Regions:
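Positively charged, amphipathic and often flexible ligand-engagement surfaces
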Residues: 231-242
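Catalytic alpha-helical scaffold of carbohydrate-active enzymes acting on polysaccharides/glycoconjugates
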Residues: 1-164, 169-231, 246
Length: 246
């Protein structure tokens, strides 16, 4: 637009079982996680082959080698929890509180090492600690702060500084919490007009978008707070399965 060259940012959400436990049965998630591990290795090889660096936004709990329960509860140090009316259980109800060897869908420090061992230098970003939804009105600032603090601590165990953030389900919220923890950039909401709709209309328009292969529009990074930048996502890559094979 002004003669300057653009930059393409490839950001990948690494969440395994943490990404959908509120929607999908755990046995199915764990089976999917096993397949995801295979595909992650293939993707890393491709990125190396074509010398493409990516931002890997990792759920912080995956960086743990394991965890255990205290007084019958998981992660009593990560308090308070978000108080979602649509998920009345404890957020960690499905956390196996075992180890990466026993539960590789819930812990993945090995995948972190795969990423760091590649020839291409990738960025490690945060995707929260336990995939809570910061932008949900029922997620308080104190809950977001506790979650992000836990993510920073988990990353520090691997000497990984966190400077970028990807919101779970792309629900943006509590930007002041991010900035206070040293986050400098986050992936913001897609500015495409139809992506702001909800329900059946969104699903219909999204399907047509995928079917027609409409090109994404260029976006600009925006400094939303001093030292904190919004880099909007503008193209969501989907697996070619089901009707998307068309």
């Amino acid at each position: 637009m002004n003669g300057q060259r653009g930059t393409m940012v490839v950001s990948l959400d690494l969440e395994l079982c943490w990404g959908r436990f509120d929607k999908v049965p755990v046995p199915m998630l764990e089976a999917d996680a096993s397949e995801e591990r295979i595909q992650i290795r293939r993707l890393l090889a491709l990125l190396d082959r074509y010398e493409i660096p990516a931002t890997w936004a990792i759920v912080g709990h995956l960086m743990l080698a394991g965890c255990s329960r205290h007084a019958g509860a998981a992660h009593t140090d990560v308090m308070p929890r978000p108080d979602y009316s649509w998920f009345p259980k404890d957020w960690y109800v499905h956390d196996p509180c075992t180890s990466a060897i026993q539960s590789p869908g819930w812990y993945a420090p090995d995948i972190l090492e795969w990423i760091r061992a590649t020839r291409v230098r990738h960025e490690i970003a945060s995707h929260s600690f336990a995939h809570i939804y910061y932008g949900d009105p029922e997620c308080s600032a104190t809950a977001a702060r506790a979650d992000l603090t836990a993510a920073v601590v988990a990353a520090s165990q691997h000497d990984v500084p966190l400077r970028s953030f990807v919101f779970p389900r792309n629900q943006v919220g509590h930007l002041d919490v991010l900035r206070a923890q040293g986050i400098r950039a986050y992936r913001g909401a897609d500015p495409t007009r139809f992506r702001r709709t909800k329900g059946a209309l969104y699903k219909t328009l999204s399907f047509l978008d995928q079917l027609l292969g409409l090109p994404p529009k260029a976006v600009r990074a925006e400094e939303v707070m001093p030292g904190l930048w919004n880099i909007p996502g503008n193209h969501f890559y989907m697996a070619r399965n089901g009707v998307r094979k068309m």
